[in-house]
């Protein structure tokens, strides 16, 4: 064989070796790509056999397969969040509330609830929702435990391997009917909100029957102080010295009840926490200039109506907004963030406690006291209107702020009450595109009930309220406005698709839910409706006795664009 032929064969062999090496590299790259694609599908919940879909509430047994991939997902989640640690669980009638000892943010969709049966079998269901709770904690809502499964629910990320035995941590489940649920520092006292102490509505209780217990987290140390005031679901006690001296500490606060015979019962279970740093922050706020007029409200799924309400009342002079969100799932956080970006001073406070409107208002009165001279308590479907300003050609802008400012120096006036006019559907069958103030123009003839704007520092220490008004300190009274000066337009009976949501649950503590066959003559109910959300044939014509376009005319003349006619809250149409 010639040297030329030998050289040619060597070149062919070299080419084959290079080709084999190239194919091996391509094969390895292809394998890695397949691995990461599979990992993506697992994390995106694309393979139903490995995870549970978030839009399904059907039980699904968890099969612990592909442990290598699960370990990878574990590492991924550990990089994003600290280990999930369930601090407390509260059993509500229609869901379980899990309180986490750290933050995970609102709307985390990759969380699943893990249930364990009597034989240690596991069941995985998607979480209902998640949210921020306070500065340090988060909450997750889970479906109620199915039959034969424990309510001591655990929490994991979707795609993680279900552990047969969880790390040792609190397994307690609190009954919503008997638990301390919130606490807030007010000066040298703490206000504790608790279910299960008394069912006496609208009356103060003897504080000598109550004490507050303060327990330092992760410690056996406990301190007890005597109650100063008590009413409904509120107990106020003095702060212990240890909290004043340790502002960096966190305390669990619970309430002890002493019966009339002097026997002390164990402290009620509690998920309420306070932080020593809260008292320092409040002292710093107290030194600043207060807003003249603020508003507190509690709502559920009112995001579509919030913009009109805030823009209009801001024009009347409201400077600060406290929104207590009672389990909304309609994008309320995004709406508030948008309003804040437009320089409206709005904050959202997560309030997961059902049927506690009175307590929520008391809580807000304490929070707002350091920032506001006056605080209004009214709903998103209620709008202040000044008929005299309209009829006499007086400017209505800042009218509400000017009104309360006239009484700021009056130490004997702690509350300003305004009567309400209830409006009906006004012949409409769909939500008015220009908002409630323009769309609903027919009302009942006679006013019913009232709404209040209060001076927080002139309330009784018990913070007793009946939603529509608060109890004031001895010697302090209220001012009732005549209708010609101011009224509240209450768009109470809207088109049926909006109105029927009221059947879901009433927010006030002592108001019976409409599905229950009780107190059907109550003013809280709609006359002529039973216990089911069935639309009457003549609904659009009901509650219409007087056509009143006063507020509509005011809004159109002051808010409508002169060229397009659009109102500023018609954002979607303008886009």
Swiss-Prot record:
Main location: membrane
Keyword terms of this UniProt record: Glycosyltransferase, Membrane, Transferase, Transmembrane, Transmembrane helix
All copies of domain GT92, residue ranges: 293-540
GO cellular component: Golgi apparatus; Golgi trans cisterna; membrane
TM helices/strands, residue ranges: 22-44
GO terms, molecular function: glycosyltransferase activity
Topology of this chain in the membrane: Single-pass membrane protein
Subcellular location, record wording: Membrane
Matching InterPro entries: Glyco_transf_92
EC number: 2.4.1.-
Similarity comment text for this entry: Belongs to the glycosyltransferase 92 family.
Name under which the protein is recorded: Glycosyltransferase family 92 protein At1g27200
